[in-house]
């Protein structure tokens, strides 16, 4: 059954798509906004780079990016394992009571990263960040349900969880020594402990110091329980739920507070908005994220058609501009412009409108005049924010003046002013001064902000950075809205003055139309106020300090870090926007998870900033390896290892190609941070990495001529028992008065004279040491039970090449080559002769390395388990370990109590 013509039921807005009449069914305004904003950004960027370099200007998939961020929230940066990693292993020699104990952490670390080249600083940065991330990953583990066994009524640790591998040495030990080892293993008693009212197992094991520092920091983070942080988070979520009309669900509180549950809070709420807004060139990306995560789905509804029929089109013959446009139907493109208008209204100051150049519509005076009238009632132009540009405001003023001077009904007295500016005249019998409707961005006269306080501060908002509340048309967003009754009897200054001016100009029919449209108009802006102040309030909302200066900067033409997005609309779309209202029909699906998305994003940004701050110090600490380094190198290195969704958000507007060094260094120096478990572990990893030997990087590499030992085998049994080996690892640095420091300048000077090799030969003949600069080198560890390859034995701590070109000789010197620490274990048989290891010509080795870390030690049987001095805490098998970060969601979205 069809609705009666006077039914007070809003109807969706039809539009022409080609030659077919179509209707909206809840279009995703967020996706449309992304496309339009990106279209504008692409247009500007393509002009910037037309004569320079190519930039990827494809529109990113925002939904895919947000899904990726949500997956980051579900990822855990720690591992739950039953046994720690093996930290020490033993290399067996022919001796029965002497072995080489190897710290396996340094072995694994030496394999991480690429070769360092002083001419490619980006590789050095990438290597360092990979090593730091490797350290953080190795140490971030939680012990749970460790394997144990019973020994004479005592619970003892299984040998696999002690961190020392003794399996390789047991077969070669004597029975007495095996009994000694077994006695120590049987003494690894598991003690019962209590951490934060939870029962745990405590035992002593072995662990590399660097890995243990990360593990200990993680364990301390968990043991701190963070009850106060959780209370603050829950309280804040309740505040946010009240602001956004959502219910915070506390179902998970019953579960995780059970005594058999260990809970981990890896993220903190709320996110620090300053972290999000400090990112270089972030305003458009944050605007898009705000739209995508918060903007509700809605339809365009029309007012009661009887309003126009009893006012504008009541006569059979209608010649007025409003009557001409009343029966028109928008095209798909024009309805897109209507969406742009509502986007600008929902994001005042951030999105502003301008009139597109369309000669066809400019030739239609009726369209321009109608748009000039309703534009003054739809848009705000000061004093606190604006929806339109100065050019558009002036064009609307001209169009309004044309409408007032368009005498289609009767002659009205007009008295012109002296300036010739738009609206500089008095009209009507009462001589209404139309100057008050000319745009003035300082006072807001002539538009919706005229005589109103449309930005106010009331109760504290959940997000500290955005305390403003928008009040279009002086409507309080806390009011309940019922379309059938809301707006009746309401008014505001600009609307009243428009009615007075229309009556003075003899436009009684149009004045009657606007009187009847007032309730619909007030409902429209009441909905917009609610969407802005409730749904769109998030960490991605523009900070108040930046919002407050947008208008002033635009008026004076000053460029700041945050500039508005300008969207182009057509004249007639202003009329269609006035005749339609955006009605939310479904709240955003990601509204309840938006705080978690913000926290994950802010946490990742903080970790990236921490990495960049640490890398910015490297060039000052090690200038020889970073001669050609620039801040862009460590920026790219950190971006390379950052999660893809975070990089995609930062580059939503394809702005990374335009970030300069000033932007980077300014961001790195800002103090804003977002606390999280990941940041705590990252900072601890960098604290460990301050000693670069922990990353298997060293600058203590020397050139020294040393003869490879060739011992006589006079007593083979004693030789085997002592476990003879040779290494190029020094126990201490050489005497400083015997060391010659070769800087790049000295080496280049002698190379230019063609005397580098001769100079080094003289130093070697004097049995002195040469240290080539202070460059950091990657160190590898290798073990050999036979003669190492010649490329290792004869390796030099520098690369020196010469070539001739055009009659000139060029020399290339590089210091940052890989260095190998090798251990040569001598194995002999009883059948060997005394001179079996002696060669006629001795073998010389040229590279020596000194490191303070004891990577390899020769130990006796009694020292094999002496490294079991680290305290491990393991959660019992019947305890549950639960990461409650995913539970920190706002909860259930409430239906708006206004329909």
Curated annotation (Swiss-Prot):
Keywords: Virion. Disulfide bonds: none annotated. Residues 1-21 are annotated as: Disordered. GO terms for cellular component: virion component. The keyword Hydrolase does not apply. It is found in: Virion. One of its GO terms (molecular function) is structural molecule activity. InterPro entries: Inner_layer_core_VP3_Orbivir, Inner_layer_core_VP3_Reovir. Pfam families: Orbi_VP3 (PF01700). Its main location: virion. It comes from the Viruses. Signal peptide: none annotated. Belongs to the orbivirus VP3 family. The VP3 protein is one of the five proteins (with VP1, VP4, VP6 and VP7) which form the inner capsid of the virus. This is Core protein VP3.
């Amino acid at each position: 059954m069809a609705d009666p013509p006077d039914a007070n039921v809003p109807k969706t807005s039809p539009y022409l798509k080609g030659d077919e009449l179509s209707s909206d069914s809840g279009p995703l305004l967020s996706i449309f906004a992304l496309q339009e904003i990106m279209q504008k950004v692409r247009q500007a960027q393509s002009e910037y780079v037309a004569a320079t370099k190519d930039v990827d200007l494809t529109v990113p998939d925002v939904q895919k990016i947000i899904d990726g961020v949500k997956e980051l929230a579900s990822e855990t940066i720690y591992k739950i394992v039953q046994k720690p990693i093996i930290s020490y292993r033993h290399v067996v020699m022919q001796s029965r009571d002497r072995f080489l104990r190897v710290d396996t952490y340094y072995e694994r670390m030496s394999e991480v990263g690429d070769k360092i080249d002083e001419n490619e600083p980006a590789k050095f940065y990438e290597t360092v960040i990979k090593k730091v991330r490797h350290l953080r990953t190795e140490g971030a583990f939680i012990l749970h349900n460790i394997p144990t066994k019973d020994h004479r009524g005592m619970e003892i640790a299984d040998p696999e969880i002690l961190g020392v591998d003794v399996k390789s040495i047991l077969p070669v030990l004597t029975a007495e020594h095996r009994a000694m080892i077994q006695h120590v293993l049987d003494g690894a008693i598991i003690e019962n402990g209590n951490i934060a009212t939870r029962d745990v197992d405590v035992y002593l094991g072995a662990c590399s110091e660097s890995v243990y520092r990360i593990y200990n920091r993680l364990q301390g983070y968990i043991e701190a329980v963070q009850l106060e942080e959780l209370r603050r988070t829950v309280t804040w979520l309740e505040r946010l739920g009240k602001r956004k009309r959502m219910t915070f669900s506390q179902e998970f509180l019953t579960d995780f507070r059970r005594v058999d549950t260990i809970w981990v809070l890896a993220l903190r709420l709320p996110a620090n908005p300053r972290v999000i807004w400090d990112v270089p060139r972030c305003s458009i990306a944050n605007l898009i994220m705000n739209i995508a995560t918060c903007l509700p789905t809605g339809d365009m509804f029309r007012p009661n058609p009887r309003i126009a029929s009893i006012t504008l089109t009541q006569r059979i013959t209608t010649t007025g501009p409003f009557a001409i446009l009343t029966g028109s139907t928008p095209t798909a493109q024009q309805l897109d412009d209507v969406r742009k208008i509502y986007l600008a209204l929902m994001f005042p100051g951030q999105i502003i409108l301008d009139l597109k150049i369309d000669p066809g519509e400019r030739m239609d005076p009726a369209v321009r005049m109608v748009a000039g009238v309703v534009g003054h009632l739809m848009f705000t132009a000061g004093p606190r924010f604006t929806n339109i540009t100065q050019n558009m405001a002036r064009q609307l003023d001209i169009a309004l003046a044309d409408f007032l001077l368009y005498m289609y009904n009767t002659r009205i007295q007009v008295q012109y002013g002296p300036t010739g500016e738009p609206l500089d005249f008095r009209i009507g019998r009462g001589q209404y001064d139309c100057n008050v409707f000319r745009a003035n961005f300082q006072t807001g006269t002539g538009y919706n902000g005229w005589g109103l306080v449309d930005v106010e501060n009331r109760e504290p908002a959940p997000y500290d950075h955005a305390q403003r509340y928008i009040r279009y048309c002086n409507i309080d967003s806390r009011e309940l809205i019922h379309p059938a009754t809301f707006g009746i009897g309401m008014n505001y200054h600009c609307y009243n003055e428009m009615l007075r001016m229309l009556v003075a100009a003899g436009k009684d029919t149009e004045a009657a139309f606007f009187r009847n449209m007032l309730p619909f108009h007030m409902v429209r802006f009441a909905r917009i106020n609610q969407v802005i102040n409730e749904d769109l309030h998030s960490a991605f909302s523009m900070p108040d300090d930046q919002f407050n200066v947008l208008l002033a900067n635009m008026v004076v033409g000053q460029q700041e870090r945050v500039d508005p997005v300008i969207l182009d609309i057509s004249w007639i779309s202003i009329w269609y926007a006035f005749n339609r209202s955006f009605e939310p029909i479904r709240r955003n699906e990601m509204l309840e998870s938006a705080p978690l998305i913000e926290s994950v994003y802010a946490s990742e940004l903080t970790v990236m900033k921490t990495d960049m701050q640490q890398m910015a110090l490297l060039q000052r600490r090690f200038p020889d390896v970073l001669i050609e380094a620039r801040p862009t190198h460590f920026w790219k290195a950190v971006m390379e290892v950052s999660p893809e969704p975070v990089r995609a958000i930062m580059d939503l507007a394809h702005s990374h190609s335009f970030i300069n060094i000033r932007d980077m260094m300014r961001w790195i120096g800002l103090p804003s941070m977002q606390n999280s478990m990941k940041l705590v572990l990252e900072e601890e990893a960098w604290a460990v990495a301050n000693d670069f030997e922990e990353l298997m990087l060293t600058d203590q590499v020397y050139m020294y001529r040393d003869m490879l030992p060739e011992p006589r085998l006079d007593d083979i049994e004693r030789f085997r028992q002592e476990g003879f080996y040779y290494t190029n690892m020094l126990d201490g640095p050489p005497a400083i008065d015997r060391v010659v420091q070769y800087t790049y300048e000295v080496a280049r000077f002698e190379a230019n004279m063609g005397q580098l090799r001769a100079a080094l030969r003289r130093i070697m003949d004097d049995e002195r040491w040469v240290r080539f600069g202070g460059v950091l080198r990657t160190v590898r560890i290798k073990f050999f039970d036979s003669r190492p390859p010649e490329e290792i034995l004869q390796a030099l701590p520098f690369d020196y090449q010469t070539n001739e070109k055009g009659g000139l000789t060029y020399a290339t010197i590089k210091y940052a080559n890989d260095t190998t620490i090798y251990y040569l274990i001598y194995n002999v048989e009883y059948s060997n002769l005394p001179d079996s290891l002696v060669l006629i010509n001795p073998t010389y080795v040229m590279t020596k390395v000194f490191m303070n870390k004891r990577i390899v030690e020769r130990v006796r049987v009694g020292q094999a388990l002496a490294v079991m001095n680290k305290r491990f805490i393991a959660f019992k098998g019947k305890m549950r370990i639960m990461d409650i970060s995913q539970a920190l969601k706002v909860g259930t979205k409430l239906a708006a109590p206004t329909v």
